[in-house]
Amino acid sequence: MTEYLLLLIGTVLVNNFVLVKFLGLCPFMGVSKKLESAIGMGLATTFVLTLASVCSYLVETYILSPLGIEYLRTMSFILVIAVVVQFTEMVVHKTSPTLYRVLGIFLPLITTNCAVLGVALLNVTENHNFVESIIYGFGAAVGFSLVLILFSAMRERIAAADVPLPFKGASIAMITAGLMSLAFMGFTGLVKL
C-alpha cells in the first residue's frame, strides 16, 4: 500500500510530466490563459489519461505481448488513445455543452498530447502491473491538472499586472513556467523510486 502512495506522490509532485519530463507542453501553454478552460481541460485530461493508461495496459498484456507484436505498441496505443478521446468528447458534449465550447479544438487535441502517449509507454517500460498503471496514469493526470490550474491562475494575475512590453505574452509565460519548475524541484528528495 505504501508503494502505491509513493508512486502517486512521486508522479504528481516529484516526476511531474509537464515540469520535469516536459510532456504535454502544448495544452499547458495553449489552454492556460483562462482558469475556467484550464479546469475543464484538467478534468478531461485526467479522465483520458487514467482511462487510456488502463486500456493501454490491457492491450499490451492481453493482445500485443501474447501475440509477440510489441513492435505495434506505439501505433496501437495511439489508436486506443484516439478511441478514449472520442468517448470523452461525446461525454463532455452531452453533459456540458458550455465546457465543450470553451475547450474547443483542445479536446480533440488530447489525442496528440504527448503526455497521454508518454504515460502509456512509460507504464510498459517501467513494468507496472494493473493497479500501478491506474495509479501512474491518475497521478500523471493529477500532476498535469495541478500544474495547469496553478499556471492558469498565475497567468490571469500576470495579465492584470503591469508587465513590461518586451515580456508580455509568451515571454512572461515561459519565465513563469520556469519558476514553477524550480519550485517543483523542491519536491525532488521527497520520494525515492
From Swiss-Prot:
The complex is composed of six subunits: RnfA, RnfB, RnfC, RnfD, RnfE and RnfG. InterPro entries: Ion_transpt_RnfA/RsxA, NqrDE/RnfAE, NqrDE/RnfAE_oxidrdctase. The keyword Cell inner membrane applies. Its EC number is 7.-.-.-. The chain crosses the membrane at residues 5-25, 39-59, 67-87, 102-122, 134-154, 171-191. Keywords: Cell inner membrane, Cell membrane, Electron transport, Membrane, Translocase, Transmembrane, Transmembrane helix, Transport. GO terms for biological process: electron transport chain. It comes from Aliivibrio fischeri (strain ATCC 700601 / ES114) (Vibrio fischeri). It is found in: Cell inner membrane. Belongs to the NqrDE/RnfAE family. It is a multi-pass membrane protein. HAMAP family: RsxA_RnfA (MF_00459). One of its GO terms (cellular component) is plasma membrane. This is Ion-translocating oxidoreductase complex subunit A. Part of a membrane-bound complex that couples electron transfer with translocation of ions across the membrane.
